Amino acid sequence: VSANGLPQPPACGHSLVADASFHEMLPLRLVVAGAGGHAKEILELIQQQRMGQPVMYDEAPSSLARPPFCRLASHTNPPALRREFGNRGFPFVLAVGSPVSRARLYDRLVSVGGWPRSVIAGTAVVSGDAELSEGLNVMHFALISCDARIGRGSLVNARANLHHDTCVGQFCEICPGAMILGAARLGDRVRVGSGAIVLPGIRVGDDVTIGAGAVVTRNVPDGVTVKGVPAR
């Protein structure tokens, strides 16, 4: 414990996930929704920022049985969360990539008393003029530029760029290295693949998938998948 009374993380090289004593010192329990690869990255950010003591939630017991999740408290159904936390509710963070899964988990946990929190890496660059909704993941070295807007529950992954005046809808997944250029607009539940580029002013509808490395040069209607250069 430091001079100011805050718990200190274990020494460099020690697994934060495995250190139960460190978690027990954190007063707030924080539900982590998802138990896959992205959840590992979210756990690291939670622990680095001392956001709270992780409690895992995933509806697949086999996922929770794998390390590092097997070392943490966990639940597999919403009623169990309600029983544990009671009427006071609980904070949660989304820890999956898929737009559909993010939306489903968000709705399910809110329905049993959860309230969403965002996880934003300290290395991310976020403009003071950007508008960020609740329940976001903003990962390492992401850029969210001036007057950008991001809807609730979206994921901006590592080194993704949202440039000036862009608008990203709800529960979107902006994959690593993707670039959404000035004043482009994405609908809800859009997945932008790694390294893809959406050119300035382009409009992308709801439930669209943009393939990795694609360059989107024209507007995209709802519910389609586009890929290639130019994206079709």
Model-derived features: where do they sit?
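Glycine-rich hexapeptide-repeat left-handed beta-helix
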Residues: A35, V93, A158, C167-Q170, ...
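Short alpha-helical
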Residues: G37-K40, V100-S101, E131, V215
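Left-handed beta-helix
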Residues: C12, S98-R152, V156-T166, A178-I180, ...
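Short amphipathic alpha-helical segments
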Residues: L43-L45, F69, R104-R108, I150, ...
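Short loop/helix-cap segments at secondary-structure boundaries that form the rim of catalytic
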Residues: S62-F69, D129, R218-P221
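Phosphate-bearing ligand-interacting subdomains
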Residues: L64-V125
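Hydrophobic, well-ordered beta-alpha structural blocks that scaffold small-molecule cofactor pockets
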Residues: S2-G5, P9-R66, S74-R83
